[in-house]
């Protein structure tokens, strides 16, 4: 099975320009290719991971990746299938975000070894050197307005309005391809399926300006089995930056993937062989309640993104919280595991009587209910059941001198911080 066949078998090929020519190029020698990442935030997220890992698979097959950080295009904003204009960021912010994204990409691509080691480029380096007049004369003249307006990504915005700034975005992305081909002999661009219009602007410019053929391959935009856009948890993006989405939160995200999606995601997001995945699928289908596919997915992706130690910590947090063993976890681990539960910062004037604190922290709705909860054995401090109505919270209840975990019943948690 050649690399293109494997990508197809994994569900990673959505659309290509001349497929036969692309397969020929990939099987006859080393291809230099690029994927672009606009710094629209200070971190990449799971939605980017499909293209990143596809790039890694091609590198493992001997091809040479260029990771392009859009320091210039990030200042403009991509209109593709967006309902409204993006807010423009300052140059300083975009450059700062660009540096962070460069660091994240080095986790996945090999920038050190071999003749196909990855290269990092930033399109700000060339766009900052081109005057507006030169850009119009040397690039803009190759694009007709009719051609630009025919793109689906633009058509959808004509009704609501699109600025010239965003309208010109596709020409900038097209020029990226031309520049990388001219300087580094890059002949293939990889990106999300929503980028098709911008990406083919690059092949058009190559054909007209340099009489060369470029290839484009898009990866699918991933949705779950209900059609919901993939990569968000509770409406929030799942970030690759551990400070924005902890390894535990990412682990839980994968653990909660639906049965109908789990095996498909193993093919897309892990480097397990297709034969290994077929074995997992067989075991998984025989006992779905054991969630083997989800557990494997969580292990593989968290290890890939954050490392083995982070995976082990996420697994330990999961197991200890499930067993109610709060005291076996550090304050930092508890902050990861209980990041979504109510948090109350204890004030110096607060009563430390347990019944009072249950009401103050919003765990019980009233003192009467709080007393009943304590007497009925429904209240736990750091995993220990407390039935003393006169119990006073003390330093002994502080984990690492930072927090106390209170649980009411089986599932209602609150964290007291000091």
Swiss-Prot record:
- Where the record places motif 'KMSKS' region is 229-233
Q: Which keywords, in A-to-Z order, does the entry hold?
A: Aminoacyl-tRNA synthetase, ATP-binding, Cytoplasm, Ligase, Nucleotide-binding, Protein biosynthesis, RNA-binding
Q: Where in the cell is it found?
A: Cytoplasm
Q: Where does it mainly reside?
A: cytoplasm
Tell me where on the tree of life, at the top rank, the source sits.
Answer: Bacteria
The Swiss-Prot or TrEMBL record annotates one GO molecular function as:
RNA binding
Name assigned to this protein: Tyrosine--tRNA ligase
Which GO BP terms apply? tyrosyl-tRNA aminoacylation
| One term under GO cellular component | cytosol
Which residues participate in L-tyrosine binding?
34, 169, 173
Motif residue range(s): 'HIGH' region: 39-48
Q: What does this protein do?
A: Catalyzes the attachment of tyrosine to tRNA(Tyr) in a two-step reaction: tyrosine is first activated by ATP to form Tyr-AMP and then transferred to the acceptor end of tRNA(Tyr).
Annotated organism of origin: Streptococcus pyogenes serotype M18 (strain MGAS8232)
PANTHER family found in the cross-reference section: TYROSINE--TRNA LIGASE, MITOCHONDRIAL, TYROSYL-TRNA SYNTHETASE
